[in-house]
Amino acid sequence: MMEKKKALLLGDYTDAPWHPLEPARVELEAILGEAFELTATEDYDVLLRLQTEAGGYPLCIAYTDCWNRELTKAQTAGLLRYVAGGGGLLVIHNGISLQCSYELLQMIGAEFTGHPPYQKLRYSRTAEAQGHPLLEGVEDFVLDEEPYLFAPDPFVERRIFLEFEFEGNRLPAGWEHDYGLGRVVYLQPGHHAPSFRPAPYRRLIRNSASWAAAGRVESTLG
């Protein structure tokens, strides 16, 4: 049996205005449990130790709901060091609330600008990303979800692999890019537990976690 990799899930149990961590934790444990040993926490100070903890975490998953507060400078620096040094960062839905720090906004690759009402959305793979390992075994899918909208960071070369249809337009719903020696993936769906249940999206989450985690494995970190 292949040894499981360690993954850190960061979110908010007690101070989550819209997206509490526990429902997402249950779903992610079911999706990733065969390949990852998942540790969930709402202690943002864990970011200070990501580079140095014994054994380390090849993957950090952000499901943070910190829209109304900023990370400390030390917490921000810890996450930046971790990813630049080879750690993988998977940001799901409201995890983009880390944009409260402009440095983290740039690392994620875009700014959340708002969302129209919750509604049925059709998600599809982009033509440009056909053959990307993130899309292996992933079919198009339909999901009731919050249509998060974004303004791209002009200095980040994102590779968009997932889109959703909204008012006659096809808009980004998933992208990836390198950051130093690390890899960053953003996935838009994830408002609540049912968001995680379509089989194609579960496969996409598994692919994204494995792909992002490989950045650290292939880095020069000791």
Per-region residue spans from a language model:
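Helical hinge/lid and interdomain linker segments adjacent to catalytic or ligand-binding clefts
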Residues: 6-10, 16-98
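Short, glycine/charged-enriched secondary-structure capping and boundary segments
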Residues: 22-25, 74-78, 104-107, 175, ...
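Residues at the C-termini of beta-strands that transition into short coil/loop
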Residues: 11, 42-44, 93, 138, ...
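A glycine-centered loop/beta-turn motif at secondary-structure junctions
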Residues: 3-7, 16, 152-222
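Catalytic beta-strand/loop cores that center a nucleophilic Ser/Cys/Thr
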Residues: 26-27, 31, 35, 106, ...
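A structural signal for well-ordered alpha-helical scaffolds and beta->alpha junctions
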Residues: 21, 25, 101, 127-131, ...
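A glycine-rich, often tryptophan-bearing local segment used as a flexible ligand/cofactor-contacting loop or short
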Residues: 69-137
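Residue-level preference for short coil/turn positions at secondary-structure junctions
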Residues: 3, 55-56, 85, 130, ...
